[in-house]
Amino acid sequence: MKNNNLTYEKSGVNIKAADNFVKFISSLSKKRQNNKNFQNIGGFGSITNIPKNIKNPQIVASTDGVGTKIEIANELNKFDTIGIDLVAMCVNDLIVQGAKPIIFLDYISINKINLRKLNKIIKGINRGCKISNCELVGGETAEMPGTYSKGKFDIAGFSVGLVDKKKVLDKSKIKVNDLIIGIPSSGVHSNGFSLIRYILKKKKIKLKKNKFLKKELMKPTKIYVKEILKLVDKKLINGCVNITGGGFEGNIVRILPAKLSAQIYLYKVKPKNIFKWLHSQGVSDKEMIRTFNCGIGFCVIIKQQNFKKIKKYFTKDFQPYVIGKIVNGKQNINLNGKIEW
């Protein structure tokens, strides 16, 4: 006799829970959408208009995740800001080319649909989109029993931005004697967490009982969209760098023209307390610099005469300051002095 009791739900996939999550996302999205073309979450694809004020639009796309910061979120059972991190990691890359973020999509894979957890994550994503002035237009939630262990998940984001061809920030605009301006980070952002978790494990630090680390490690990545796009609009910058994994050396080199180098004055960098703590745990200067942002989350390359002009576009906590300059060379990053931990 045949047994016809096999169902998708018995295999570990709850379609009804997934549908309820889509409805929740749609309700969030509709609250802040002004353009009817955006109201299509749950469809097969998302449609949007190209803003009329961008005369010769160039498309810029970026995708990223938040790495093992999700493990810290899981340990602390705190999921309301990890979505902001996800948006930040994508849109901060878009603005390096001078692009305005237009749309954002997310991908969440999880062992079992947990609406409480997922609702908090998506609220954070929605908040990140609001800060970035872009729209959450869709995504994918994959319930994957057997792939992830109990309670585990991963998230990824994808964002598209537009920039007028005449305003694209490319290497050709960067010249000798341009200043390298550091813009403070909000903290660790979303890079280096595998090393942080290794330190916590090796030092047997109980994260839940450490108020300082709980607060610092879950601070959301700073989104620089508003400030940088104002500078692009005012034609005050020649280049941008998002300081992520690889630190100063691994990221600044990516925007240098072939015959130019960067001089970085490490002694001018102002490390936040979390970086001082990490250094005190036995992480060498070299490892700190190539793994973490060390207090500088974003850099802009500007003409010397524009420094005073850009300061007014930043709040008190994110006031920019000079950390280096562009010199002749062969795409080298020259690190001068030491960071004062």
Functional labels for PLM-detected ranges:
Residues 69-70, 190-192, 233, 252:
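Short helix/loop capping segments that flank catalytic or ligand/cofactor-binding pockets
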Residues 2-12, 27, 117-132, 148-153, ...:
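Glycine-/charge-enriched secondary-structure boundary and capping motifs
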Residues 27-186:
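Glycine-rich phosphate/pyrophosphate-binding loop regions near the starts of catalytic domains
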Residues 176-215:
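Acidic, glycine-rich loop-and-beta core segments that form the ion-binding/anion-interacting portion
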Residues 22, 54, 67, 143, ...:
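Residue-level detector of flexible, active-site-proximal loop/helix-junction positions
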Residues 49-50, 160, 201, 300-302:
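Short beta-strand-to-turn element immediately C-terminal to the catalytic PLP-Schiff-base lysine
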Residues 8-32:
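Acidic/polar, glycine-rich intrinsically disordered N-terminal extensions of enzymes
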